[in-house]
């Protein structure tokens, strides 16, 4: 009987056996877009700065972050961190605490006195920015880094815009706000406070500006047609929050009713609680339809704030309100029932939304205004050449993160326009979804939760409610990042390859593959 054919190899080496010939697939580098990056309205490279943070190089992490967003200490406190909702780790155990690490980096930078990187050239161009809120100051920062002279006109007495007048101190301490605003000014940005722009064309001509970015915040509170007696005390939410920045605090009385269901209504109710009042929120829909974020509502309820659902205010008097109860119809819409109730109230605060003062645009040719906002093209330029707009002035979600992103986008387009060019954003890569990941590499690691001030102190002081992580916890949280879609040289492939087909090239150079021996195992 014939023996089967066989190959004998030198027992000292198996190099002659090119196992790569068995391969049906081969490893290649394919960088995908992390879902957190895609979700971030400010356009941060979250995976990029987390990579530096997890190695303990906090300054590099902060500098990588501030290339896109100059306000990490602010954002670590007020951003609604939708990036965490998109985080792939949330399908493995819990999402990475991106916002808490950003909070830590922002505070670390302030503690260590790190400065923002300034311009290296002078373009000779001068850009006007109207409004010193998140969008305006973000644009000023990026424009200055491009080498342009920047002058910011702010109608109010302070920097910060709606971050100061729309966000209470217990969420955003004013020393943090002022420190991060000042860092932008220190780059050479000129700021003119108490300087309201009445006519944009006249101001541009008088200042010989080459372009303008309009970022006026929504500071005008919307009113409701509520019949009221002469002695009824009615105030809009933004006016109330603004008055909290002055020395003379508003006199609301003990029983304060807040009408509305958004985040501003929550902020006003929590502010009133800290002033010693007994706030009650009246909202015409159910909890499920409330536009305020769930965690904000939960925080308010923990502090003892009550909500009267499915109710509308029909009459305001000196010391009482008449409320009509609502009921949901078959389609889920609230309808009046004809059933009324009288509740005691010393003051009524309307938190029904805000509008932007567009008076500075009167007479500007080419501009299109619709539903109280300015229409802009993809490059964020209005219908008038050289005038760009963003933040609350344009059709978009209104929050700090979106405003900061608008400022950055507009600055890039303004810079290109001033150079007679067009800014073309880089093509977006395919998103690295959970299905693309080899999750068996990662052990369970519970999310680190930031400390919170106890409820008793929250009810009676304006101390910051949410604390920050210490270095140990921030480092742990950064290391929970899966680095979705990008090689970060974790060495797992190098360690598990039985054929030594993965070859290290050194820090930052990734790896190369010996295809003679790689069997394409997919590890």
What is each stretch, according to the model?
Residues 149-152, 156-192, 269-313, 422-436:
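Rossmann-like dinucleotide-binding cores of NAD(P)H-dependent redox enzymes
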Residues 34-55, 76-105, 151, 158, ...:
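Iron-sulfur cluster-binding cysteine motifs and their immediate structural context
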Residues 101-121, 179-194, 200, 221-275, ...:
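Glycine-rich dinucleotide-binding loop and its adjacent helix/turn
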Residues 232-254, 330-397:
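FAD-site-proximal beta/loop scaffold in flavoenzymes
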Residues 268, 393-421:
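A conserved FAD-binding loop/helix module that cradles the flavin
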Residues 125-151, 264-273:
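N-terminal Rossmann-like FAD-binding beta1-loop-alpha1 element of flavoenzymes
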Residues 6-8, 12-28, 299-302, 311-314, ...:
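Mid-to-C-terminal Rossmann-like scaffold of FAD/NAD(P)H-dependent oxidoreductases
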Residues 19-39, 62-81, 113-130, 135, ...:
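Ferredoxin-like iron-sulfur electron-transfer modules
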